[in-house]
């Protein structure tokens, strides 16, 4: 199990990203629009830099829904390889069968 504080921190980052998403998209559009004057684009970049660092989507870490483990994460299943193996072995994931040859 991952530390509760790490899992909660990641949840807080997700909330911040959701809160500032529209503002961030609008500022990025202004900053990247080459038809606008340079000063206006620069102001948009400054405003973007003043937003909280954790409001950027790259700060979100994919974590296992079962254990909170941050590594070896399968996106489709939203869980780590270890949780997948345990749940798969106990037959709790439909359609997952242990391979044998």
Curated annotation (Swiss-Prot):
Keywords: Ribonucleoprotein, Ribosomal protein, RNA-binding, rRNA-binding. It comes from the Bacteria. GO terms for cellular component: cytoplasm; small ribosomal subunit. SUPFAM superfamilies: Glucocorticoid receptor-like (DNA-binding domain) (SSF57716). Part of the 30S ribosomal subunit. Contacts proteins S3 and S10. Belongs to the universal ribosomal protein uS14 family. This is Small ribosomal subunit protein uS14.
């Amino acid at each position: 199990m991952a530390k509760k504080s790490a899992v909660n921190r990641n949840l807080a980052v997700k909330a911040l990203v959701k809160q500032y998403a529209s503002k961030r998209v609008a500022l990025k559009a202004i900053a990247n629009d080459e038809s606008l004057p340079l000063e206006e684009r620069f102001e948009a970049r400054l405003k973007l830099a003043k937003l909280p660092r954790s409001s950027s989507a790259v700060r979100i870490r994919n974590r296992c829904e079962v254990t909170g483990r941050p590594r070896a994460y399968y996106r489709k299943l939203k869980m780590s390889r270890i949780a997948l193996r345990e749940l798969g072995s106990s037959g709790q994931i439909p359609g997952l069968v242990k391979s044998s040859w």
